[in-house]
Amino acid sequence: MLRSLWMLMLSLTLACSDTTGDSAVPPRVPDIFTDGYFIAGHQATALAAIPPVWLAAAKNLKVHLMGRSHSTQVTVGLSRLEADSTNYSCATGWFSLPEEAGTLNIYGAQSGTPYCDFAFYLNNSDGIPGNFTDAQSIHAVLMRAPALSVSVFLWCRDLDSMTSNQVHDYLVQLALLEAQYTNVQFVYATGNADADGAAGHLRARNNRQIRDWVKLGNNRLLFDYEDIITHAWNGSSWIQSTYTLNGTNVPFINPAYNPAVNGPEYEYTHANETGCREVAKAFWFLLARIAGWE
């Protein structure tokens, strides 16, 4: 896996046609990896922009993905993209790593229980007999599945209530993992945009803190889930959904993806099928960049 510093600036505006079920595909400019970081946000969703050679390279990555129900937007979305085209073939194991040739293989550690949180990801057992244990912590997983080359932890609603000190601890812990496992690319992530009111305002602040950390460089990668799920293309421009609290615009899940507005909810993911697809497109884009696409 490439961990070198990609400094090439992309100035080409991509006008592409997508074959994954979207009726209106905008000209999209991929988010740029520069100054030692890359953020996969709402513009990093143009699947047709990924050269076939880098799509194939992305499939060679072995991905560890942990999270609760919101994280299934990635795996469910990936399955829908694969149904559209075998170019996007993927296989997800349940607490195991599949070994399918020519396919993106994902070690899925996902659950609707409260135990797949970041503390669980790090090392902590829930202490409850019969429930998941620290055998699924990132350390234990990497010992059991040393072929893994990428690890992603995705938030549920934790960031709606976390303090800035707790967010800082998350960032420091991931940086320590980066230093400990230099052959694994750890991906930072922002949280979802479901909450409104004071909780949503706090979540947005915490997400900004995560972005600011990633922008410090050191080859950091961010899956900007909040940015992806709050933006939608209206046929001529990107529209971000927000609400206002105390004079501040706060990002909020876009109506195009919100099952409460454009339902139904798709496979218990807290988004509709369109939202799952958009999240999965950005995930492919991110993996292609990790594989070396500039």
PLM regions: where:
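Loop/turn elements at helix/coil->beta-strand transitions in domains of secreted/extracellular proteins
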Residues: 59-63, 87-89, 146-152, 179-187, ...
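Histidine-centered active-site loop/cap adjacent to the catalytic His
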Residues: 244-294
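Alpha-helical scaffolding within the catalytic cores
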Residues: 46-50, 129-142, 165-176, 205-210
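N-terminal carbohydrate-binding/catalytic regions of secreted carbohydrate-active enzymes
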Residues: 32-141, 278, 282-290
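Substrate-gating cap/lid alpha-helix
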Residues: 191-234
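Bacterial N-terminal signal peptides
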Residues: 4-15
